[in-house]
Amino acid sequence: SIVRGTQLRETTEFLYNSGAKKVHVRPACPPLLFGCKYLNFSRSKSDYDLITRRIIKDREGENVSKEILFDYAKPDSKNYKEMVEEIRRIQNFSSLRFHRLDDLIESVGISPCKLCTYCWNGQE
């Protein structure tokens, strides 16, 4: 899973061991920065189960303000770009690009106020 940084790493190693020269990863959604507090669809029990939050913790420490977390959710911010690069490096991907939340919302065609985006941007 790209969410926790577990299974996909093993799959990547399998691909390289099977002769792949490069592994390019394109997840179907933006990076998850906040655990779902509404549906509990993830097996994650702590925000630190999320690879994004572990990277933020390594960079910023444990008591990170909401403002800093929100900056990591902005795909044009330096923090976001460096977080994605760190995920790519840790997972040994040749490249990693996430969908942008604004593009995802636009493609769904539903008013943003009717969509839950909490796990991506922390906005309730």
Model-predicted segments: where are they?
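PRPP-associated nucleotide enzymes
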Residues: 1-124
